[in-house]
Amino acid sequence: MPMRRNLLIAAAFLLFCHAEVNAQMMVVNTEATSDLLMAPNIGLEVVTGNHSSVGVNVLHSPKVLGFGLKLSAIQPEYRYWFSYRPVNKWFVGFGGIGALFEGTIKEKHYDGYGIGVGITYGYVWNITDRLNIEVHSGFGAFYYNRKEFFEGDNYDVDYTEDGAQRANAKGYYLLPTRIGVSVSYILK
């Protein structure tokens, strides 16, 4: 698990190293939809040109919706803004997602990771000079690799090779990658 976390941190670092140092604007945000699901998150977006910005959102929750499901995720994204002022009006985004999850739902245990890519479309309203409200919706492909078993199964015996447990479920989902309402504050 520490290796996966380090990879996620490295991916976020590389994303921001690519952004121009003399960025015109920096924005910090939180997605209200995730907050309502008890998955606190924070994001940082850096404007890189007249029509572009890059950003990353991270979230972590020890109990999504109060269930015993732990979730950590990172979502880097490139956005193209259709207006001549980034972080204003219509945009389309291309991004990725990396997630680690573990928990039990209806006596079935899940433990694994997922990665994916997707496209996002949205609109930003400027409430004040520094405060914005954003609505967005996204769709993409998500690959997962996980251990999946019912409580009481002999998972540790049945799915062990050379002393290491292996995943017994992997595949792809086509699903919404980002749907929500965000509140953002322009720092610079």
Regions found by a protein language model. Give the residues of each.
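Outer-membrane beta-barrel "beta-signal"
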Residues: 173-188
